[in-house]
Amino acid sequence: MNYFPWLTIIVVLPISAGSLIFFLPHRGNKVIRWYTICICVLELLLTTYAFCYHFQLDDPLVQLTEDYKWINFFDFYWRLGIDGLSIGPILLTGFITTLATLAAWPVTRDSRLFHFLMLAMYSGQIGSFSSRDLLLFFLMWELELIPVYLLLSMWGGKKRLYSATKFILYTAGGSIFLLIGVLGIGLYGSTEPTLNFETLTNQSYPIALEIIFYIGFLIAFAVKSPIIPLHTWLPDTHGEAHYSTCMLLAGILLKMGAYGLVRINMELLPHAHSLFSPWLVVVGTMQIIYAASTSSGQRNLKKRIAYSSVSHMGFIIIGIGSITDPGLNGAILQIVSHGFIGAALFFLAGTSYDRIRLVYLDEMGGMAISMPKIFTMFSILSMASLALPGMSGFVAELIVFFGIITSQKYFLMAKILITFVMAIGMILTPIYSLSMSRQMFYGYKLINAQNFSFFDSGPRELFVSISILLPVIGIGIYPDFLLSLSSDKVEAILSNYFNR
């Protein structure tokens, strides 16, 4: 038991300090921006300090645990703790949220509410990744939806209300299944409700009931991940949202679904997962091909990047379905890797829109001449997205490949077929990625326009882009830094499958 409540402070600080924004004196938006950035930086420093000095890498058990009785009436606890699975997403959340607040510098309308919602979302996300109680996980999952809905409906494009409504209908529908699953597991087989992850890991269920629970959780996480065919909210949402919100959606929100699949479906329901894993692999493979080929036909720049996100999430699903050490490690690495790359691409797409006020690729062209810095950063990150060796995406996708090839669960012909289809998906990725760069940056369309006067990236935008690029290259060159965090926990999860 840890005596200093590090995780409680990390979870509660953003939303509690964020609520003080409304009491700041009226001295323009600059005060609010700096205050929000300071909270995010302080939070990131606290998280890094707590993990560096209080987290043992060689211990697969839950660390920094906190366990407080919250509501006596139905045995509800405030249980927090981290292990090798949650440490990567928590650090990713802190990093991306800090850069997203910096990216939101141009937002001037209702600035207080905007920054408060970003901080409230931050608390919900950290809470989801660090909760060790099933009901607390559900509460944090829901807490995070409200700020996202408001951010989508109040700031963005002309169809933002439509996309926000679509988002909330999909996610609230998924949350119903999540709540049913949480209550079903908590109330099963005992007079006292049991919601503690540690207790539930050792709980066994009749196979039919376990399959029902599994399907309920799978639907909830499939909406968030997103897994086809529950992905249609994502392109609309990304197409209309402000780019700082897109950074949070692509960088963190999608990763919550993948995290939930590993944390609940894999860890708590191993029998059902071993039955469903072949279907997950098939759906993941279809998703890579479908999203990559659909992305090529998108005229809207942000929708094209959104479909590329759906395609990359396919690798995570295949890694989770492979039930192997490399497959699951690769999926966790891809969660962090795509969090950085997706956020960076949306940021650069948004800064480009701020300058040229165009969203359709066939209206762009010639940006490379007037904006060489944006061109350079976008080109490098496009290469990272298509898994160029030396970038984080390459390592993650390669390890997932090894995972599916070395899996004992599938026949040789099935593995060859899956690998072949995945390889086709990886060939389709450069097609939409490089054609996107060509349509945006090459040619003369914008130069021939009457009001041709565009300025390149300023110091703030360059700082955000480089800050995201450095971890992408760092993970690509030395992936062991992240893999060493998760490998012990992955072995502990997979021991449920091989000891039966």
From Swiss-Prot:
Mode of membrane association: Multi-pass membrane protein
Coiled-coil residues: none
Molecular function as annotated in GO: NADH dehydrogenase (ubiquinone) activity; ubiquinone binding
Keywords: Chloroplast, Membrane, NAD, NADP, Plastid, Plastoquinone, Quinone, Thylakoid, Translocase, Transmembrane, Transmembrane helix
Top-level EC class: translocase
Principal place of residence: plastid
GO (cellular component) term, any one: chloroplast thylakoid membrane
Places the protein is found: Plastid, Chloroplast thylakoid membrane
Annotated transmembrane regions: 4-24, 37-57, 87-107, 113-130, 134-154, 167-187, 207-227, 242-262, 272-292, 305-325, 330-350, 386-406, 411-431, 462-482
Pfam name, any one: Proton_antipo_M
Catalysis: reaction(s): a plastoquinone + NADH + (n+1) H(+)(in) = a plastoquinol + NAD(+) + n H(+)(out); a plastoquinone + NADPH + (n+1) H(+)(in) = a plastoquinol + NADP(+) + n H(+)(out)
Family assignment from sequence similarity: Belongs to the complex I subunit 4 family.
Classification via HAMAP family: NDH1_NuoM
Protein name: NAD(P)H-quinone oxidoreductase chain 4, chloroplastic
UniProt source species: Carica papaya
